[in-house]
Amino acid sequence: MNHICPTVTALDVHAYREQLELVSSFAPRIHIDLMDGDFAPTASPNPDLLWIPEGVEVDIHVMYRNPDAILERLISLKPSLIIVHAESNADIPKLASTLRNHGIKTGIALLPETSAEDVRYVLPHTQHALIFGGHLGYHGGQADLSQLAKAEELLKAQRQLELGWDGGANLENLDELIRAGISVINVGSAIHKTDNPETTYATMKAKVTPV
């Protein structure tokens, strides 16, 4: 199944609430970005101030240099999936074991400079790989579709891996993302910056749903 996941990328609690209430009103699966202001150039609110809605599948994308610093808090939020960066200081096999004990899936995110080969050793510990084709901590920007070359390599290394895409997804490039093997497409400004985000979401969802 292919998923369109509206993203929540907020720099303050007010924006977080606004974005979260909007996208969770129409999308069954959403993607929340958390930034530390160090690994990522922008900073999201303190995770202690955040919450996630019931009845919605939530992926949390942790753009932190030290994800362990907030791991306990994230686990308490009970998301479906926590994604950490290959470039972070996380001990991913250990982190994955902790998450598994709490019934939470583990994802690994790859910045453009990180190859599929670089993360091959952690793939047996993960259920999801996020190919990053945008800019850390911001909505908007162009998708670097050259990063899609990683999709085939990742799936060759682990056939059951769920592949996600983050960065510049829109109606024009959805087909190319799906053809490359991406099944979870995280969408920011292409939904948030339209006159009717719910209608745009429905249009995108229909485009990636097989007839």
Q: Where in the sequence are the language-model features?
A:
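Conserved N-terminal beta1-alpha1 strand-loop-helix module at the mouth
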Residues: 1-83, 87-91, 98-100, 105-106, ...
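Generic beta-sheet signal
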Residues: 7, 61, 109, 132, ...
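Active-site/ligand-binding-proximal alpha/beta "capping" segment
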Residues: 130, 134-135, 141-184, 190
